[in-house]
C-alpha cells in the first residue's frame, strides 16, 4: 500500500485529503496491479470513488468498524440495558456492536462497488 496522505485512525480536522497526483503516478507505474488504500476511515465518498477509479481495489476501514461497534455498545450500556434481566450477558451486551459493524460493512460494500462480487 502506498502512502498518498492517508493515515490509520481518525483524520485530523485540518487533513487536506488524498494526493491523487501521487496515486495516479503510482497507477501509471504499476499498470493493472490492484492497489490497497490503508486508512480508509473518514475519507469522503467522492475521494473513495476517485481512488477506486485510479486503481484502488481494497480499502481498509477497520477504525470505522471499531467506532461503530463502540458507539452501539455505549448506547446499549447508557440506556441501562445491561442492568435489565440478563442484559449483562456478553452475547447480549455485544450484540448491538456486532450489528453496527455489519451495517457499516454493508454500507462500505455499496460504496466500494463490491456487492455481488466474490
Region annotations inferred by a language model:
Residues 31-34, 57, 85:
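Short, well-ordered coil/turn segments that N-cap beta-strands
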Residues 19-25, 52-60:
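Short, electropositive alpha-helical surface patch
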Residues 14-37:
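Alpha-helix-loop-beta-strand connector modules within alpha/beta enzyme cores
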Residues 4-9, 54-70:
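Glycine-rich phosphate-binding active-site loops on the catalytic face of alpha/beta enzymes
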Residues 1-21:
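Glycine/Thr-rich beta-alpha phosphate-binding loop at enzyme active sites
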Residues 40-55:
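Catalytic cores of alpha/beta
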Residues 77-118:
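Extended, intrinsically disordered, low-complexity segments
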Amino acid at each position: 500500500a502506498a502512502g498518498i496522505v492517508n493515515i490509520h485512525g481518525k483524520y485530523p480536522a485540518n487533513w487536506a485529503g488524498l494526493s491523487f497526483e501521487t496515486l495516479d503516478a503510482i497507477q501509471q507505474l504499476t499498470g493493472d496491479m490492484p492497489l490497497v488504500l490503508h486508512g480508509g476511515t473518514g475519507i469522503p465518498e467522492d475521494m473513495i470513488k476517485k481512488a477506486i477509479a485510479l486503481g484502488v481495489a481494497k480499502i481498509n476501514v477497520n477504525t470505522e468498524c471499531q467506532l461503530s461497534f463502540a458507539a452501539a455498545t455505549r448506547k446499549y450500556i447508557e440506556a441501562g440495558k445491561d442492568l435489565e434481566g440478563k442484559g449483562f450477558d456478553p452475547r447480549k451486551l455485544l450484540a448491538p456492536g456486532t450489528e453496527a459493524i455489519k451495517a457499516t460493512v454493508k454500507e462500505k460494500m455499496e460504496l466500494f462497488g463490491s456487492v455481488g462480487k466474490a
